[in-house]
Structure formats: C-alpha cells, structure tokens
C-alpha cells in the first residue's frame, strides 16, 4: 500500500473505527436492495492504515491473474526466441550472403570456419547451413566426416548413421545399405556406394554435403588418418568431374594444426577453390551486449506481459547488486558464457508455472549456486543436443 496525504482532513483525524462485520452486512444489504449507496460511499472514503495514522492508504492496483493458457503461449514463444538468439551468428561478416548464394548453388565449394571458440557458434552456423540447404529443391545428402577421418574409424553398426538424405522418398529408401547391400566397414566404401547410386539416375541433381568439426584446440593433426584423407580427396576428385553432383565440404575448426593440414591437402589435390570465414573475436563489452540481447525478447511488442518482463530484466541488469547483474558479472570470466546463460535461463523458463513465478526466479533464484555450471558439459568438441540443431530434412 502506498501512503499519501488525504484531502479528507476530518476523516483522517477521526478516532472512530467501524466494525468490519457492519461493513460486510451493509454491503450485503446494499447489493440485495440494488441501490449501491454504501458501495458508492466506500469508493469516496479514504481508508486509514490505523486509527493513529496521519496518512491514509491508496490501494495498489489489483494484479490481474494471467490466464494459464496465455502464459503457456508466452513461455513457448520466449523459449523459441531464446534459442534463436542463442544460435544467432549475425556478427559473422558476409556469412548470410555466402549461404544464400554460393551454398545454394550447384557449384562445388570448400568452406573453413576457423576460430570457432564456442559451442553456440558451431551450432548457429550449422543451423544456418541446414536452413539454407532445406530450401534447395534438389536432393541433398549429408555425410558426417568425423568418424571417417579419425584414426579409430567406424564400426559397421555406425555405417547407417553416417549418411542422411533430404529429397525424394525413393532415393531416401536406397540409403539403407545394411538392408540392401553388404554392410561396409569404411565410410569411403559407403560414399562410393552413394556415388554409384546417384550416377545411375542422371535426371536428378544432387548436393553431397560433407561435414567435419574439430573444436578442441589441444588436439594435434595426428588424429587425422592420412590414408583416409587421401581416400576422401579421391572421392572429391571423382565428384569434380560429375555433371549432376555438387559437393559442399564444410569444416568447423578451432584447431590450427587440423585446419592447416586439411587446407594444404585439399588445395594441393583439388581444383575447387575454398573460402575461409574467421569468427570475429568479441570484446568483453560486445559479448555482454549480445548476452543481454539474448534474454530480451521482441516476439510481441504490444504484449503487457512482455513489457513487464523486459522492464524487469532491464531494471535487474542496471542494478549492480541484483542476482542477474551478479550472474552477468560472472559470465565475463566464464569460458562458455552463451551456453551457460542459455542452459540456466532455459531451466528458469521451463520450471516457472506462472508469470509471477518467472519474474521471482529472475529476481531471486538466478544464481551460480542454484544453477551451477558444473551441471552442464562444456567440452568444446561435444555437439549440442539435437533439439538445438535443425537437420536438413526437418521441414
């Protein structure tokens, strides 16, 4: 209750206190007789906090209960925008233009994404690539290269997982090699099977998308099997001469040795030109700005709920003693600030059953103790859960 001076001086100084039972009875009679005399009087009379108080109380606005279904919609849209903001790679120069033009064309290309410092950068680019290729009308085949190029190799049980396809159902069915042909122990054999099947149908254009990622700085180039790399280059050489197949080789790397090895080998043996995108190194101030944008939503600018939410977040960030501001201060020195904030904030939104509970958790519950970073796995070479990445064939 907010206390204000009243213009009703005689009432303010009155020592008489009305019995609450009499008020209830008077209102009941008033409603029964439908003349509303008492209710009109009550609306005009200021109410004192106590008999001796020199001030009267001004009632606070009554909080409207947020409809459960309406809040669930708000919650769903908030989670969706949080995920989109987390995976945003808008700060990578010329990337959108490259994806929309070069990657969608049938022209062969080799692309290096270097200095990928954070998991969210890898996932963001990967999703952008998937979205771009999902708009291509021709058939797209995805081949994961990590298991193939590593020394350990792959087992026959994994052969089926190495290739995904988006496009015509008849072609997708042919990719189940374990059911139709002898299982392969090597991805190179598996790739050549794909090439033979594709070449048998020259009426269809295809893009074969090879993906390799190594985000661990500490790994050395010796993890790449030289013979496998030679085999892979031979496959690409065959594809260079094909009329109805284009290949896209995308390499996500935070390892100078691996980037150098692959770059030198591919450049020496192939005619295809390659493109290098270096991830910009954000300053601490830029990083904080992106983190703040990540939790400020814009999905419905006219929504009172959204206005209340954004107002609270802004106030909390501006108050250096608030839990949210302290949490952000910790993110300045944490190696994976985007992923940590995303994980903790996702939990807060998911766990909140009401809008008031969401605001309360942001004010009072968002702490390192309540959402410890030890609960999350931040290994740089670990890929994000499938729910955070869109596969090409998911429309």
From Swiss-Prot:
GO molecular function annotations of the record: telomeric DNA binding
Keyword set includes Nucleus: yes
Any GO BP: telomere capping
Coiled-coil intervals, chain numbering: none
Note: Present with 589 molecules/cell in log phase SD medium.
UniProt GO cellular component terms: chromosome, telomeric region; shelterin complex
Quaternary structure (record): Interacts with RIF1 and RAP1 C-terminus.
Role played: Involved in transcriptional silencing and telomere length regulation. Its role in telomere length regulation results from either a block in elongation or promoting degradation of the telomere ends. Loss of RIF1 function results in derepression of an HMR silencer, whose ARS consensus element has been deleted, and in the elongation of telomeres. RAP1 may target the binding of RIF1 to silencers and telomeres.
The protein's name in its UniProt record: Protein RIF2
Record's keyword annotation contains Cytoplasm: no
InterPro entries per the UniProt record, alphabetical: RIF2_ASCE, RIF2_lid
Subcellular localization: Nucleus; Chromosome, Telomere
Signal peptide interval: none
Gene3D superfamilies from the UniProt entry: 1.20.120.1650, 3.40.50.12060
UniProt main location, coarse: nucleus
Membrane-spanning parts: none
Native source organism of the sequence: Saccharomyces cerevisiae (strain ATCC 204508 / S288c)
Sorted UniProt keywords: Chromosome, Nucleus, Telomere
